Structures are given as structure tokens and as C-alpha cells.
Amino acid sequence: MLSLTMLLLERVGLIIILAYVLMNIPYFKNLMNRRRTWKARCQLCIIFSLFALMSNLTGIVIDHQHSLSGSVYFRLDDDVSLANTRVLTIGVAGLVGGPFVGLFVGVISGIFRVYMGGADAQVYLISSIFIGIIAGYFGLQAQRRKRYPSIAKSAMIGIVMEMIQMLSILTFSHDKAYAVDLISLIALPMIIVNSVGTAIFMSIIISTLKQEEQMKAVQTHDVLQLMNQTLPYFKEGLNRESAQQIAMIIKNLMKVSAVAITSKNEILSHVGAGSDHHIPTNEILTSLSKDVLKSGKLKEVHTKEEIGCSHPNCPLRAAIVIPLEMHGSIVGTLKMYFTNPNDLTFVERQLAEGLANIFSSQIELGEAETQSKLLKDAEIKSLQAQVSPHFFFNSINTISALVRINSEKARELLLELSYFFRANLQGSKQHTITLDKELSQVRAYLSLEQARYPGRFNININVEDKYRDVLVPPFLIQILVENAIKHAFTNRKQGNDIDVSVIKETATHVRIIVQDNGQGISKDKMHLLGETSVESESGTGSALENLNLRLKGLFGKSAALQFESTSSGTTFWCVLPYERQEEE
């Protein structure tokens, strides 16, 4: 029995080593995070089927005299049995992928075991199917909670799976005496080894994914800090003064030896190692930067020669260079240098790729703000709604609070905030957008607001598909929804409903409606709302005034903002031409 245990431990060790190697491959880790999709399930079926086939092939042959032999077997004699790690691989397949994956791997493993032959080979097809279904059931329960079974629970399930195997041997074998004799030899070693192996396999999966999640949380926290501190300088545009401050902030927050920012032609700032010859106002020295400016793609190098600095005593040995874009055109680069090539890891690359998008958006935001100040002759443009700084910083603070609690939710909100910014930038340059884009902007805004005040607002959007390509002014619905959230409900914590709908007004016009069940508008302010700024504890009402001016400027006085208000709620609406976006 001890010899069998040691031989089984060798087989389990091989499985565990392969599991560890797989879980350190980024593609496989991403596959685990997408395990509920059918594409991922099919891929998991293939991977775990290979594990199961290997378990069968590397089993330990046991004859009637209890002699043990271990090798790679494709076919077995009719009077021998096989002890292996098949139950481990089928069980883990079910725990990870659910019933479909567990059943599939169980059937494949069982069929191959029957093909190999041996005493009562059909028994192992039956037991494999049972094990796959039962393990898949426990896996499905964990999936519904968006978790994996705990290590202790995985070990207990491994024990149960092996007991099912032993019960199947006893029940379905033709020679009961031989079955009892076989079970007395293999039961304890296989139960112990395969249950421990199942627990270790699952612990590798859980710990690897948890480590990645913690890494993402740290990255998100670092990115948020960078965004908070660099945003004011990016808004000034890409010049020497702002670039110097940005480079200092990045170097202080990230483990890099030097940071440089360039325009398309010259070095704007260089902070850290190599600053004696990488001097601002000089022409770009490195061939690496020139390559990135030409190709528009991020580049990573790990030698001095690849950096391409001509100075003989340059201490820089590795670098990652990020192109900075504005409206699709390259305007400069952000470069992070390392004096030790080993300091440039996968984490730094992932962080750099994220910063590239964020910094480019911030540059566009700053450029849009600069341009808006210069458009003195464009009345409608000057009335476009702008991103509220209070909303931005409140959103950043909310995401920061979520980073340590729920990093995945924080990541989702960060993407919503990015989409919100981009939509605002696009809206500031357009007279009209489709209703579908406007609703997407509203949903991004609501995601951020509902993260700050969970469960406080109920938003109902009732818009038929045929109206989704109707052209509307940017921020039309967002401003009305935001107005309801800020002013309609005072301190009421629940039961706050906002309804957004679009209905047909005439054959050529539609009515857009935003309705709330708040406290209503006081009579002394009703005649002023939308016509002039209205002072209140939570705002001036200028957003509604600007919106009304834009509506009338674009579509005439008939499109002016209208409303009705009682103590049980307020309804805003406007009637717009049924103009649709032309198909390209």
C-alpha cells in the first residue's frame, strides 16, 4: 500500500507541475477568468481532457498478485487493473468548468480507459461520468457566486469522488471477490493522494488568480494617483513646464530610474538617471523614440544598444516608450527608463499600456479645454456641457475606495469614467449625436453615481430601437437626469425613480421625456428655470439654461425645454425633429 501511495504521489506531482506552469501563462489565466463563456468551456474541455488522458496513460498496473508496475500503457491485459489520477483531473475539470466540462472530460477519459482494456474496464466509464457530473454541480454552485470552491471543500469533494469510484467498482464489477480485494489495496492510497492533489491543484488556481487580482488592485491604485496628480498639468497642454511636473510625479510614484517626455521634435523634460545629457530643449537623442514616433506603437527594449543613445556614459539599460496621441495623431512620447534591465517586468508593461490611453485622453481633454476658450464666435459650441470637476474627483474618490474592496468593480468603473470623458470630448465638438450614444453616456454617468450612492436611485430607460438613431444635442438626457439626481430628492435615501422615455409626437417629431417622483420645484423658481441661472444650495441651474439655449439654437423655439411639476414629481420634455443619422 505504501509503494502504491508513493507511485501515485509521483503521478500527482507531474499533474501539479503542469498545473503550475499553465497558471503562469497569461492566456490560461485569462481563460480561467472567462470560464463561464462557451468558448472558454470548449477550450477547458480540451485542456482537461489532455490531463485525463495523461492520467490514464501514466497509471500503475496492478495484477491479481498485487504486483505494481509503472510505465506508459496504451493497452492492458484483461486480468489487470489500473490505479491512476484520472479522478483528480475529472474532478478539477468539473470544479473549474461546471457540469458541461466535467461531463465532457469524464466521457473522454472513460472511453479512453475502456479502449485501454483491463479487468472490468467499463466500470471506469460509468464512474467517470458520475464523477464529472457531481464535480460539475459543485463547480456550478461556485460559479454562481463568482468564486472557486475553497481548498478545504475541494479536498472533501476529492474524497467523495474517490468514494464514488470505489462504490462503482464494487457495484458494477463482474468478479465481486476481486473487486473487494482491489478496493482493499487501492482505496486508501487513491483517496488520500487524489483528494490532496485536487486541493493543491485548486489552490494553485485560486492563489494565482488572487495574486493577479491583488496586482491589478495595486496597479489601479497607482494609476488613479497618477491621474489625480497629472490631470492639472495635462490640461495645460504638452509644454516644457507641464512636462517637467508630469515627469517628476511619474518618477516619484513608479519604480523607474528616469522619466522623459518628448514632443515630436524635442525633449520636453527628463528627470532621473541620464539627465546630464538628455537635456530639455535638445533634439531627440535616441533612435528608440524616433521609431515610436514613426510607428505609433509602444516599444520595450532591454539593452543600451536598443535604446540607441549615442552618449558613451549613458547609464540607461532598458526602456519602455509610449506614444502620446491626440485625435489619432502622434504628438509625443512618454519614456520610462531603467538602469537595471531586470526592473522592467510584465507589470511595468501592463501599467504603461494603460497609462498610454489615459494620458492621451488627458491631453485631448486639455486641448479641448484650450480650444473652447478660443471659439468666441461659436455660440452653440460655447454652450456645450463640460465635465464637472466635482463629479470627476468624486468619481475618482469612489473608485479609490473600491480598489481595495472590489478591484474588478473598480476596474469597471474606471472604464466607465474613461468612456464618460471620451464622450464629453466628442460631444464638445459636435452639434448632434445619436440617441443611442447619448444613452450610453447616460449609463456611464449612472454607473458612477450609483457606485457613490448604491440603491438610492432607480433609473428606467424605455426607448424603442427605432428611435436610437434619432439625432439629439449632446448631453440632453444626461443633464436632465443629473438635474433630477441633484435636486429632486433632497435627502431621501430610497424610492427615488427616474424614467427616461421617447414617444412619437407627430409623423415628423418625437418627444423626449425625463420624469422623476421627487419633491417638485418651488413655485417661485418655476418661471425662471431654463431661462436664466437659478441659485440653490446645490447649483445655479445654468446647465438647464445652456441646454435650453442649445435646443432653441439648433431646432428653433418649438424645441424649447418644457416641464410640469407638482409635489409628487417633475416631468421635463422637449419635442425634436425626427432626424436620423444617415447610413455611411
Swiss-Prot record:
Its main location: membrane. Pfam families: 5TM-5TMR_LYT, HATPase_c, His_kinase. The keyword ATP-binding applies. CDD domains: HATPase_LytS-like (cd16957). Coiled coil: none annotated. Autophosphorylated on His-390. The modification Phosphohistidine is found at H390. The chain crosses the membrane at residues 2-22, 42-62, 92-112, 121-141, 154-174, 186-206. GO terms for biological process: cell wall organization. GO terms for molecular function: ATP binding; hydrolase activity; phosphorelay sensor kinase activity. Keywords: ATP-binding, Cell membrane, Hydrolase, Kinase, Membrane, Nucleotide-binding, Phosphoprotein, Transferase, Transmembrane, Transmembrane helix, Two-component regulatory system. Its EC number is 2.7.13.3, 3.1.3.-. InterPro entries: Bact_2-comp_sensor_kinase, GAF, GAF-like_dom_sf, HATPase_C_sf, Sig_transdc_His_kin_internal, Sig_transdc_His_kinase_LytS_TM. GO terms for cellular component: plasma membrane. It is a multi-pass membrane protein. It is found in: Cell membrane. Residues 311-363 form the GAF domain. Member of the two-component regulatory system LytR/LytS that regulates genes involved in autolysis, programmed cell death, biofilm formation and cell wall metabolism. Also participates in sensing and responding to host defense cationic antimicrobial peptides (HDPs). Functions as a sensor protein kinase which is autophosphorylated at a histidine residue and transfers its phosphate group to the conserved aspartic acid residue in the regulatory domain of LytR. In turn, LytR binds to the upstream promoter regions of target genes including lrgA and lrgB, to positively regulate their expression. This is Sensor histidine kinase/phosphatase LytS. The lineage of its organism: Bacteria, Bacillati, Bacillota, Bacilli, Bacillales. The gene is lytS.
